[in-house]
Amino acid sequence: MLNKLYDWVDERLDITPLWRDIADHEVPEHVNPAHHFSAFVYCFGGLTFFVTVIQILSGMFLTMYYVPDIKNAWESVYYLQNEVAFGQIVRGMHHWGASLVIVMMFLHTLRVFFQGAYKKPREMNWIVGVLIFMVMMGLGFTGYLLPWDMKALFATKVGLQIAEAVPLIGPAIKTLLAGDPEIVGAQTLARFFAIHVFFLPAALLGLMAAHFLMIRRQGISGPL
């Protein structure tokens, strides 16, 4: 049944060459841990992507229960944590995954830097990678406020004060993030939720697509 469906689609769209090109792509010998033990350092990028996928899937589950409102945000998180089946596990995955993805990305960045993989002709991919790092940090910052507890509230106030200290555009950045520059309240929570769930993930997906396309085009760099 599935084979017939696949053949029907393949006859019209010729999809076999597309997935065969990916499936048959050979892993370079210098990045294969089976041949070189030190090649495990090349796994940090893939591990970063793997944890990112977990973050996306667990985040989609969390949005089914989370209420981005100052009166209900904490209660919705409490309900998710204590009443929803597997809610505590999924939230724990998202919580710890947020830290793990930064660690993996940091290790990946160190590998690229110390092996000189950012040099010509891969300068553009390095820039895209740095932008991905910044987006990930933004996701961590905006997500921290969403439980709407005291720790998150005061941490966000500190973060907004840091943003305000940016020369020239600092006050505008703070107003953009917080809504009301004087109060961390309903507008701040709503904006952080929108940025965390819509704006930054959209930017992340676009940057990751560009990152992977350039890797595919240029190949994986060896030590330089």
Swiss-Prot record:
Cellular localisation: Cell membrane
Q: For heme c, which residues are the binding ones?
A: C43, R216, I220
Q: Which cofactor does it need?
A: heme b; heme c
Molecular function terms from GO: electron transfer activity; metal ion binding; oxidoreductase activity
What keywords are annotated for this sequence in UniProt?
Cell membrane, Electron transport, Heme, Iron, Membrane, Metal-binding, Transmembrane, Transmembrane helix, Transport
Identify one Pfam family in the record.
Cytochrome_B
Question: GO biological process annotations for this chain's record?
Answer: respiratory electron transport chain
UniProt cross-references to PROSITE patterns, sorted A to Z: CYTB_NTER
The residues that hold heme b 1 are: Y42, H108, R111, H211, S221
Chain positions recorded as heme b 2 binding sites = R91, H94, H196
How does the UniProt record describe the way this protein sits in the membrane?
Answer: Multi-pass membrane protein
Q: What is its main location?
A: membrane
Q: Which GO terms describe its cellular component?
A: plasma membrane
Membrane-spanning segments: 37-57, 96-116, 126-146, 195-215
Note how many cofactor molecules are bound and how: Binds 2 heme b groups non-covalently with two histidine residues as axial ligands.
Under the heading NCBIfam families, the entry gives: cytb_ExtP, PRK03735.1
Identify its protein family.
Belongs to the cytochrome b family.
Q: How does it assemble?
A: The main subunits of the menaquinol:cytochrome c complex are a Rieske-type iron-sulfur protein (QcrA), a cytochrome b (QcrB) and a cytochrome c (QcrC).
Q: What does this protein do?
A: Component of the menaquinol:cytochrome c reductase complex.
What name goes with this protein? Menaquinol:cytochrome c reductase cytochrome b subunit
The encoding gene: qcrB
